[in-house]
Amino acid sequence: MNMSNMAIDLVGVRKSFGDKVIVNDLSFSVARGECFGLLGPNGAGKSTIARMLLGMIWPDRGKITVLDEPVPSRARARRGVGVVPQFDNLEPEFTVRENLLVFGRYFGMSARTIEAVVPSLLEFARLESKADVRVSLLGGGMKRRLTLARALINDPHLLVMDEPTTGLDPHARHLIWERLRALLARGKTILLTTHFMEEAERLCDPLCVLESGCKIAEGEPDALIDEHIGCNVIEIYGGDLDQLRELIRPYARHIEVSGETLFCYARCPDEISVHLRGRTGLRVLQRPPNLEDVFLRLTGREMEK
Protein backbone atom coordinates (compact mmCIF):
# COMPACT_ATOMS: atom_id res chain seq x y z
CA MET A 1 0.00 0.00 0.00
CA ASN A 2 1.32 3.45 -0.89
CA MET A 3 1.62 5.73 2.10
CA SER A 4 0.64 9.37 1.84
CA ASN A 5 2.96 12.08 3.10
CA MET A 6 0.45 12.93 5.82
CA ALA A 7 0.57 11.18 9.19
CA ILE A 8 -2.63 12.91 10.38
CA ASP A 9 -5.46 14.54 8.48
CA LEU A 10 -8.50 16.18 10.09
CA VAL A 11 -11.30 17.59 7.95
CA GLY A 12 -14.26 19.50 9.39
CA VAL A 13 -14.14 17.79 12.80
CA ARG A 14 -16.67 18.81 15.43
CA LYS A 15 -17.19 17.47 18.94
CA SER A 16 -19.68 18.51 21.60
CA PHE A 17 -20.43 17.34 25.11
CA GLY A 18 -24.04 18.16 25.84
CA ASP A 19 -24.69 21.71 24.67
CA LYS A 20 -21.04 22.71 24.85
CA VAL A 21 -19.02 22.68 21.62
CA ILE A 22 -15.48 21.55 22.45
CA VAL A 23 -14.03 21.30 18.92
CA ASN A 24 -15.64 23.36 16.19
CA ASP A 25 -15.17 22.55 12.48
CA LEU A 26 -11.44 21.91 12.84
CA SER A 27 -9.19 20.96 9.93
CA PHE A 28 -5.43 20.46 9.85
CA SER A 29 -2.82 18.06 8.46
CA VAL A 30 0.42 16.77 9.95
CA ALA A 31 3.21 15.76 7.57
CA ARG A 32 5.34 12.74 8.35
CA GLY A 33 8.53 13.60 10.18
CA GLU A 34 7.42 16.93 11.63
CA CYS A 35 6.39 18.14 15.06
CA PHE A 36 2.93 19.70 14.83
CA GLY A 37 1.73 21.71 17.80
CA LEU A 38 -1.75 22.29 19.15
CA LEU A 39 -1.31 25.45 21.20
CA GLY A 40 -4.01 26.88 23.41
CA PRO A 41 -5.15 27.51 26.99
CA ASN A 42 -6.85 24.93 29.19
CA GLY A 43 -10.29 24.22 27.76
CA ALA A 44 -9.31 25.01 24.16
CA GLY A 45 -10.02 21.42 23.06
CA LYS A 46 -6.46 20.09 22.79
CA SER A 47 -6.93 16.93 24.86
CA THR A 48 -10.26 16.19 23.18
CA ILE A 49 -8.54 16.33 19.79
CA ALA A 50 -5.85 13.94 21.02
CA ARG A 51 -8.48 11.50 22.30
CA MET A 52 -10.31 11.57 18.97
CA LEU A 53 -7.07 10.88 17.11
CA LEU A 54 -6.56 7.81 19.28
CA GLY A 55 -10.10 6.55 18.70
CA MET A 56 -11.01 6.95 22.36
CA ILE A 57 -14.00 9.16 21.53
CA TRP A 58 -15.89 9.71 18.30
CA PRO A 59 -16.32 13.05 16.55
CA ASP A 60 -19.87 14.24 15.98
CA ARG A 61 -18.96 14.92 12.39
CA GLY A 62 -15.93 15.25 10.17
CA LYS A 63 -13.19 12.92 9.01
CA ILE A 64 -10.04 11.80 10.83
CA THR A 65 -7.26 9.82 9.16
CA VAL A 66 -4.20 8.58 11.07
CA LEU A 67 -1.36 6.80 9.26
CA ASP A 68 -3.63 6.34 6.22
CA GLU A 69 -6.35 4.63 8.27
CA PRO A 70 -9.78 6.15 9.07
CA VAL A 71 -10.25 6.67 12.80
CA PRO A 72 -11.93 5.34 14.85
CA SER A 73 -13.40 2.73 12.47
CA ARG A 74 -10.00 1.15 11.73
CA ALA A 75 -8.18 0.56 15.01
CA ARG A 76 -5.20 -0.78 13.07
CA ALA A 77 -3.76 2.74 12.96
CA ARG A 78 -3.37 2.61 16.74
CA ARG A 79 -0.56 0.06 16.40
CA GLY A 80 1.67 2.68 14.83
CA VAL A 81 1.00 5.34 17.47
CA GLY A 82 2.79 5.93 20.76
CA VAL A 83 1.02 7.94 23.45
CA VAL A 84 2.37 10.17 26.21
CA PRO A 85 -0.70 11.15 28.25
CA GLN A 86 -1.02 14.36 30.21
CA PHE A 87 -0.90 12.48 33.52
CA ASP A 88 1.43 9.56 34.19
CA ASN A 89 -0.28 6.18 34.40
CA LEU A 90 2.79 4.14 35.27
CA GLU A 91 2.67 1.18 37.66
CA PRO A 92 4.12 2.78 40.82
CA GLU A 93 5.16 -0.43 42.57
CA PHE A 94 6.86 -1.89 39.49
CA THR A 95 10.44 -1.04 38.66
CA VAL A 96 11.37 1.06 35.66
CA ARG A 97 12.34 -2.06 33.72
CA GLU A 98 9.16 -3.91 34.70
CA ASN A 99 6.99 -1.04 33.47
CA LEU A 100 8.57 -1.35 30.04
CA LEU A 101 8.32 -5.15 29.98
CA VAL A 102 4.64 -5.18 30.93
CA PHE A 103 3.68 -2.44 28.49
CA GLY A 104 5.28 -4.25 25.56
CA ARG A 105 2.93 -7.19 26.07
CA TYR A 106 -0.06 -4.97 25.29
CA PHE A 107 1.25 -4.84 21.72
CA GLY A 108 1.63 -8.61 21.47
CA MET A 109 5.41 -8.42 21.56
CA SER A 110 7.27 -11.53 22.66
CA ALA A 111 9.27 -11.47 25.88
CA ARG A 112 12.48 -11.91 23.89
CA THR A 113 11.67 -8.94 21.63
CA ILE A 114 10.77 -6.69 24.56
CA GLU A 115 13.89 -7.63 26.49
CA ALA A 116 15.97 -6.83 23.42
CA VAL A 117 14.67 -3.26 23.10
CA VAL A 118 14.51 -2.32 26.80
CA PRO A 119 18.24 -1.46 27.14
CA SER A 120 18.11 1.03 24.27
CA LEU A 121 14.94 2.61 25.70
CA LEU A 122 16.56 2.97 29.12
CA GLU A 123 19.56 4.60 27.47
CA PHE A 124 17.34 6.93 25.44
CA ALA A 125 15.47 8.00 28.58
CA ARG A 126 18.74 8.26 30.53
CA LEU A 127 17.39 5.87 33.12
CA GLU A 128 19.99 3.09 32.92
CA SER A 129 20.98 3.59 36.55
CA LYS A 130 17.32 3.52 37.65
CA ALA A 131 16.30 0.35 35.80
CA ASP A 132 15.61 -1.62 38.98
CA VAL A 133 14.19 1.25 41.04
CA ARG A 134 10.46 1.33 41.82
CA VAL A 135 8.62 4.06 39.92
CA SER A 136 7.16 5.43 43.17
CA LEU A 137 10.69 6.50 44.13
CA LEU A 138 11.34 8.50 40.96
CA GLY A 139 11.07 12.27 40.56
CA GLY A 140 8.62 13.88 38.17
CA GLY A 141 11.12 14.38 35.36
CA MET A 142 12.25 10.75 35.46
CA LYS A 143 8.65 9.55 35.40
CA ARG A 144 7.97 11.63 32.30
CA ARG A 145 11.06 10.24 30.58
CA LEU A 146 9.93 6.72 31.46
CA THR A 147 6.47 7.46 30.05
CA LEU A 148 8.14 8.65 26.85
CA ALA A 149 10.32 5.53 26.67
CA ARG A 150 7.27 3.35 27.25
CA ALA A 151 5.48 5.05 24.35
CA LEU A 152 8.38 4.00 22.10
CA ILE A 153 8.28 0.31 23.05
CA ASN A 154 6.72 -0.75 19.72
CA ASP A 155 8.78 1.69 17.62
CA PRO A 156 5.76 3.78 16.54
CA HIS A 157 5.71 6.05 13.50
CA LEU A 158 3.71 8.71 15.34
CA LEU A 159 3.81 10.06 18.91
CA VAL A 160 0.78 11.82 20.39
CA MET A 161 1.93 13.85 23.38
CA ASP A 162 -0.62 15.62 25.57
CA GLU A 163 1.00 18.39 27.65
CA PRO A 164 4.18 16.33 28.14
CA THR A 165 6.06 18.80 30.35
CA THR A 166 3.27 20.11 32.58
CA GLY A 167 4.40 20.25 36.20
CA LEU A 168 8.10 19.79 35.46
CA ASP A 169 10.85 22.10 36.63
CA PRO A 170 12.85 23.96 33.93
CA HIS A 171 15.75 21.48 33.94
CA ALA A 172 13.46 18.45 33.53
CA ARG A 173 11.48 20.26 30.84
CA HIS A 174 14.60 21.04 28.81
CA LEU A 175 15.73 17.42 29.06
CA ILE A 176 12.39 16.25 27.63
CA TRP A 177 12.73 18.78 24.81
CA GLU A 178 16.20 17.45 24.02
CA ARG A 179 14.87 13.88 23.85
CA LEU A 180 12.03 14.98 21.53
CA ARG A 181 14.51 16.65 19.19
CA ALA A 182 16.40 13.35 19.07
CA LEU A 183 13.19 11.57 18.03
CA LEU A 184 12.54 14.11 15.29
CA ALA A 185 16.09 13.56 14.03
CA ARG A 186 15.19 9.87 13.69
CA GLY A 187 12.24 10.76 11.46
CA LYS A 188 9.46 10.30 14.01
CA THR A 189 6.27 12.35 13.72
CA ILE A 190 5.04 14.16 16.83
CA LEU A 191 1.69 15.73 17.62
CA LEU A 192 2.27 17.94 20.66
CA THR A 193 -0.45 19.64 22.69
CA THR A 194 0.82 22.39 24.95
CA HIS A 195 0.03 25.72 26.56
CA PHE A 196 3.72 26.57 26.97
CA MET A 197 4.67 29.19 24.40
CA GLU A 198 8.40 28.52 24.69
CA GLU A 199 7.83 24.80 24.18
CA ALA A 200 5.84 25.45 21.00
CA GLU A 201 8.44 27.88 19.65
CA ARG A 202 11.34 25.52 20.33
CA LEU A 203 9.85 22.27 19.05
CA CYS A 204 7.06 22.80 16.57
CA ASP A 205 7.44 23.12 12.82
CA PRO A 206 3.90 24.29 12.10
CA LEU A 207 1.38 24.78 14.86
CA CYS A 208 -2.32 25.44 15.21
CA VAL A 209 -3.45 28.06 17.73
CA LEU A 210 -6.76 27.15 19.37
CA GLU A 211 -9.28 29.21 21.28
CA SER A 212 -12.55 27.70 22.54
CA GLY A 213 -12.28 24.79 20.12
CA CYS A 214 -11.70 26.96 17.05
CA LYS A 215 -8.54 27.40 15.00
CA ILE A 216 -7.57 31.06 15.10
CA ALA A 217 -4.15 30.78 13.41
CA GLU A 218 -1.89 28.18 11.81
CA GLY A 219 1.70 28.28 10.59
CA GLU A 220 5.32 28.13 11.66
CA PRO A 221 6.05 30.01 14.90
CA ASP A 222 8.38 32.59 13.34
CA ALA A 223 5.95 33.21 10.48
CA LEU A 224 3.02 33.70 12.86
CA ILE A 225 5.03 36.10 15.00
CA ASP A 226 6.13 38.08 11.95
CA GLU A 227 2.63 38.14 10.44
CA HIS A 228 0.73 39.21 13.54
CA ILE A 229 3.37 41.22 15.43
CA GLY A 230 6.39 42.00 13.26
CA CYS A 231 8.06 44.44 15.66
CA ASN A 232 9.46 44.81 19.16
CA VAL A 233 7.27 44.69 22.25
CA ILE A 234 7.31 47.04 25.22
CA GLU A 235 5.54 45.96 28.41
CA ILE A 236 4.60 48.77 30.78
CA TYR A 237 3.50 48.09 34.36
CA GLY A 238 2.13 50.74 36.70
CA GLY A 239 0.74 54.22 36.21
CA ASP A 240 -2.52 55.31 34.63
CA LEU A 241 -2.90 52.94 31.68
CA ASP A 242 -5.43 55.13 29.86
CA GLN A 243 -3.11 58.11 30.15
CA LEU A 244 -0.12 56.07 29.02
CA ARG A 245 -2.04 54.72 26.06
CA GLU A 246 -2.80 58.23 24.81
CA LEU A 247 0.79 59.32 25.40
CA ILE A 248 2.41 56.61 23.29
CA ARG A 249 -0.34 55.99 20.73
CA PRO A 250 1.29 58.18 18.00
CA TYR A 251 4.47 56.06 18.13
CA ALA A 252 2.96 52.57 18.37
CA ARG A 253 1.73 50.22 15.70
CA HIS A 254 -0.69 48.63 18.12
CA ILE A 255 -1.51 48.70 21.83
CA GLU A 256 -3.13 46.03 24.00
CA VAL A 257 -4.05 46.18 27.67
CA SER A 258 -4.26 42.98 29.70
CA GLY A 259 -4.89 43.27 33.42
CA GLU A 260 -2.51 45.91 34.77
CA THR A 261 -0.07 45.62 31.86
CA LEU A 262 0.08 47.69 28.70
CA PHE A 263 1.62 45.96 25.67
CA CYS A 264 2.96 48.34 23.05
CA TYR A 265 4.09 47.07 19.64
CA ALA A 266 6.50 49.48 17.97
CA ARG A 267 9.12 49.38 15.23
CA CYS A 268 11.12 52.12 17.00
CA PRO A 269 10.86 51.36 20.72
CA ASP A 270 13.36 54.09 21.57
CA GLU A 271 10.72 56.67 20.66
CA ILE A 272 8.43 55.14 23.26
CA SER A 273 11.19 55.08 25.87
CA VAL A 274 11.92 58.78 25.36
CA HIS A 275 8.32 59.71 26.14
CA LEU A 276 8.25 57.49 29.23
CA ARG A 277 11.47 58.91 30.63
CA GLY A 278 11.09 60.69 33.93
CA ARG A 279 7.75 59.08 34.80
CA THR A 280 7.89 57.48 38.24
CA GLY A 281 6.22 54.26 39.33
CA LEU A 282 6.65 52.53 35.96
CA ARG A 283 8.39 49.27 35.14
CA VAL A 284 9.26 49.01 31.47
CA LEU A 285 10.44 45.85 29.69
CA GLN A 286 11.53 45.84 26.05
CA ARG A 287 11.79 42.44 24.33
CA PRO A 288 11.40 40.57 21.02
CA PRO A 289 7.89 39.35 20.17
CA ASN A 290 6.78 35.79 20.92
CA LEU A 291 3.76 33.51 20.56
CA GLU A 292 2.20 34.95 23.71
CA ASP A 293 1.92 38.24 21.83
CA VAL A 294 0.30 36.48 18.89
CA PHE A 295 -2.33 34.98 21.17
CA LEU A 296 -2.92 38.32 22.89
CA ARG A 297 -3.18 40.09 19.53
CA LEU A 298 -5.72 37.56 18.19
CA THR A 299 -7.88 37.20 21.29
CA GLY A 300 -7.35 40.38 23.28
CA ARG A 301 -6.22 38.44 26.34
CA GLU A 302 -3.18 36.61 27.65
CA MET A 303 -2.90 32.84 27.50
CA GLU A 304 -4.44 31.29 30.59
CA LYS A 305 -2.28 28.65 32.23
From Swiss-Prot:
Chain segments annotated as transmembrane: none
Protein topology in the membrane: Peripheral membrane protein
Any GO MF annotation of the entry: ATP hydrolysis activity
EC number per UniProt: 7.6.2.-
Main location: membrane
UniProt xrefs under Pfam families: ABC_tran
Keyword Membrane: yes
Domain (ABC transporter) ranges: 8-237
CDD domains in UniProt: ABC_subfamily_A (cd03263)
Family: Belongs to the ABC transporter superfamily. Lipooligosaccharide exporter (TC 3.A.1.102) family.
PANTHER family: ABC TRANSPORTER ATP-BINDING PROTEIN, ABC TRANSPORTER ATP-BINDING PROTEIN NATA
Name of this protein: Nod factor export ATP-binding protein I
Originating organism: Bradyrhizobium sp. (strain SNU001)
Taxon lineage: Bacteria, Pseudomonadati, Pseudomonadota, Alphaproteobacteria, Hyphomicrobiales
